[in-house]
Curated annotation (Swiss-Prot):
Domain of life from the UniProt record: Bacteria
InterPro entries, per the entry: EF-Ts_dimer_sf, Transl_elong_EFTs/EF1B, Transl_elong_EFTs/EF1B_dimer, Transl_elong_Ts_CS, UBA-like_sf
HAMAP family named in the record: EF_Ts
Stated name of the protein: Elongation factor Ts
Gene3D superfamilies: 1.10.286.20, DNA helicase RuvA subunit, C-terminal domain, Elongation factor Ts, dimerisation domain
Similarity annotation: Belongs to the EF-Ts family.
NCBIfam families reported for this sequence: tsf
One GO MF term: translation elongation factor activity
Region (Involved in Mg(2+) ion dislocation from EF-Tu): 80-83
Keywords carried by this UniProt record: Cytoplasm, Elongation factor, Protein biosynthesis
A GO term from the CC aspect: cytoplasm
Keyword Electron transport carried by entry: no
Length: 275
């Protein structure tokens, strides 16, 4: 008679993200002891960690922490949405986020190298990799500060954790505007805050492409400069937050929205899990 039930298998899968057969075998070997089964999965899973290095971690979640004028965001990637929504992976994300806040991490490299209870965060991820049987990464960390920081998390499905996260720093406290701009940023995916933030070489590349395209379209030479400038401005509208049409009211821009509220965005960050 089996020393475990179907509910035990389900619970072990939810805790670890490991495959069903692996969970069954671990429960058999541990004689139904769930904690021992988790340890067995870690030990056996460690052997396959190297093989998982080349696999694609295109799922995951984004977690955020805000406290007044501070915002911290971490991105965790895994291979499948099954693991992404598992209790073990979600708990891991909270551990990583708490550590990012505690050590004031500003990038993934410093966070992964930081000490967490006698081991590094990277070693914690390696253990999770072994237990869950998937490649797990923390590719990005953001830490922004301002007078007020707003956050927004977006779910693509109700049964999955948030996969898009945004932090927006303002120079004044305004929850409504902060939330509106954060939601807009999640939807419209700007790359830069102002056009001055766009690298000069990128602007020159867009200008060159616009001119070459216009010439291929046989646009009149007399109108060339105006056409090129218009297309470069379109690039700014697509990629610069302050110049984008506001998602909730395209007749106004983010700049005008902020001006009407008397606030400024000083910085922002947007992550998408799996990217």
């Amino acid at each position: 008679m089996a020393a475990y039930t179907a509910a035990d298998v389900k619970a072990l899968r939810e805790k670890t993200g490991a495959g069903m057969l692996d969970c069954k075998n671990a429960l058999v070997e541990s004689e139904g002891d769930v904690e021992k089964a988790i340890e067995l999965l870690r030990i056996k899973g460690q052997k396959g960690v190297a093989k998982r290095e080349d696999r694609d971690a295109s799922n995951g979640l984004v977690a955020v922490h805000t406290d007044g004028g501070l915002g911290v965001m971490v991105q965790l990637n895994c291979e499948t949405d099954f693991v992404a929504k598992s209790e073990g992976f979600i708990a891991l994300s909270q551990q990583v986020l708490d550590q990012a806040v505690a050590v004031a991490a500003t990038d993934a490299e410093s966070l992964l190298a930081s000490d967490l209870g006698g081991r590094t965060v990277q070693e914690l991820l390696d253990e999770a990799n072994a237990t869950m049987g998937e490649k797990i990464l923390v590719p990005r960390v953001a830490r922004i500060e301002g007078t007020h920081v707003s956050a927004y998390l977006h779910r693509t499905a109700t049964d999955l954790p948030p996969t898009i996260g945004v932090l927006v720093a303002l120079d004044a406290v305004n929850d409504e505007i902060g939330k509106d701009v954060a939601m807009h940023t999640a939807a419209m995916s700007p790359t830069y805050l102002t056009r001055e933030d766009v690298p000069a070489e990128k602007v020159e590349s867009e200008r060159r492409i616009a001119e070459e395209t216009a010439r291929e379209e046989n646009k009149p030479e007399a109108a060339m400069a105006k056409i090129v400038e218009g297309r470069v401005n379109s690039y700014f509208k697509d990629n610069v937050l302050l110049e984008q049409p506001f998602a909730k009211d395209p007749k106004t821009t983010i700049t005008k929205l902020l001006a009407g509220a008397g606030v400024h965005v000083t910085s922002f960050a947007r992550f998408r899990a799996g990217a």
